[in-house]
């Protein structure tokens, strides 16, 4: 109440910001007549003038009014589009490192040109980030005309581009590309063996289009570059038969022993997206595995040697229970292809980690591809936070404003619309069963079709869109289906969706980024006419003119029918995705309407709000086929959505807290790697490492501040001779001297090592040896960093169990990952020293050959894959398979291997007081 009163008096923060921006808009508008008087050459010349003024110390903020006015004038001349005042406000919001929330159809692409132009003046590069290659290329070509006119270069960064094309794209003033490609290029740049092979410049300024999709929906899973690990194909096939031999338990056992409706061998937790074996299930699984010869008779699944089997069994159970064909994936050309939960698009080439993809392949009977080893990884949170300036724009960000502020430090500013919105959002209708819901949807579509009103139907899966398509075919209602299977025709279908009597079924936000214009998108239709090879130029011109003439009458006709009608067949977990669907109607002040049809069978209602809504329906004694349409029910659903959003935010925040630990280590390793790459001579680095290793060796045998009698000189001589080839008479030196300091002995060792090393360098020349040293250092850093990533994954998977021992898992993860990192640096130091010190080289040619072999072994990895995996429901972060048994990973498993053999009902040896099966026995 007090907050509401304060807002009435002072206005909300959003209103106050808009008020401030409007003052600058007045300045820009006042400059318009001045720039209208300039010739094209004079207007173009303003860019160079701005550059000189900025180089002279003038800030971008002081240049902003003039730069925006110049950009608007250029747009009027080249694009025949004048920025509205609200678009100028949007441009200022983007320049101020904020997120501009602009309604669909308000011209986000044109708005971005203002902030892009201003920031490109610095010459440090501006990245415009989009969700797919099509939008990146479209916007680069479309807006590139404006930037080129103003004397700025534009590049587009697409996947599968050649190296020199990528370098040219990044060296341009403005670079368009996808979030995945920018992130992968960063990782690849930190895997090169020559600084000239890098493509990115330092990260300066990024504007992220559809910022909610990229920084929130896709932020739960990291970008991963991986290579193939050892083959477990046969094991996946054998494990695939086991879920069919196990019974599913209905209901979860509660603390008091109730809750189980039907006992079984495993329980599916839909909320947590996990599968758990019951007590009976463990025993049955052990019997089956023993019969198959995979474990010994009477042996436990939890024996350390069976950890890998446990992992494969759970992967098979999840594949059968949680991942469904045509909903989470499709099968095409002997491959399992993931369906993006948020857009409904096929994600060709992407694979689930943790052995899950292979388990699904075994289930579907397609060829099983090998598991992967992580070579490099980063989350979007940590990648985008490296930019000096970051901004974003979307139609729906306000519901996630807290997360943007908390994680990225980005404030959301809601930009007023140019024209008042006229869309009517009708109340949800909830039915008892799915069949009743779809009958109502078809009735609504039929009603709109008979009146001539276009309809866009939003579904949450390919399966639903195809089921609805079958229903409409039975009703003889003509329609278009837009889902992952048809995305090649996406632009064409969306262009037609606003025409009279058009019925379009779309999975979630397929076609996002393309406007649905009432009467049809005449620009898009004209584009298809332009590329028709069967028409002459004269025919094309005539057809385009005809389309333009027809469009105006169609536009008015559709407006009179009520504009575009949106039908949602299910509520999404996130209110934001629902708002995106609604936002397709009522663009730029056009009329429109929207309604969601739900049933008690829907996952969201079933898991989070089903009991409450069902109780209301029973209390009201609703007859079959009659819906509830009440504010209390809609509020219950929104409350359920808020719960899920909060839960997903916690998951993303937790992922970030864990990844921040790895990110600090990643920065250190990449800095070390770049220092090695860029150093003129790494000899000094190698010398420091060598001295450090020898000092540690010396102190193992001669502790500081000890007497001569306590020194292990014989042991030291042996280690120096066997490990380092140094024959030093240390014992004789001590005997021959009346008294000797330990530091004098150490100096003697370091000097002897230095002389031997320099003798080796002299044989082939300093320059040749420096190249070899660089290759050895890079090889050691890269190979051990990969092992370290696998070790961190292993640590991460089991760290939650520390909670049972009353320890904070995050603190334990930080502590142990730091210990692993210290060990990593130690291993690199020792390996580099040993290889460079003991290498037997006779000629520069041999040395060069050795360097090339090292570099080739690491830079030409087989079957390298680039993944940004998205689990179904986007609920969980990707982790690589625990079966990767690199040296560091095995070290991380030692704790498990060291656990005594314990019965499942015995107290857990960790000291938590729980039974083993409810504590560390839960390890999967």
UniProtKB/Swiss-Prot annotation:
Span of the signal peptide: none
GO biological process: intracellular protein transmembrane transport; protein import; protein targeting; protein transport by the Sec complex
Membrane topology: Peripheral membrane protein
Superkingdom as given in the UniProt entry: Bacteria
Main enzyme class: translocase
Cellular component per GO, a single term: cytosol
Record note on cofactor: May bind 1 zinc ion per subunit.
Required cofactor names: Zn(2+)
Keywords: ATP-binding, Cell inner membrane, Cell membrane, Cytoplasm, Membrane, Metal-binding, Nucleotide-binding, Protein transport, Translocase, Translocation, Transport, Zinc
Family annotation (SUPFAM superfamilies): Helical scaffold and wing domains of SecA (SSF81886), P-loop containing nucleoside triphosphate hydrolases (SSF52540), Pre-protein crosslinking domain of SecA (SSF81767)
Residues annotated to bind ATP: 87, 105-109, 515
Locations listed in the record: Cell inner membrane; Cytoplasm
Enzyme Commission code: 7.4.2.8
Tagged with keyword Acetylation: no
Protein family per UniProt: Belongs to the SecA family.
Quaternary structure (record): Monomer and homodimer. Part of the essential Sec protein translocation apparatus which comprises SecA, SecYEG and auxiliary proteins SecDF-YajC and YidC.
Name this polypeptide is given: Protein translocase subunit SecA
Naturally occurring in which organism (per UniProt): Cupriavidus pinatubonensis (strain JMP 134 / LMG 1197)
Lineage: Bacteria, Pseudomonadati, Pseudomonadota, Betaproteobacteria, Burkholderiales
Name of the coding gene: secA
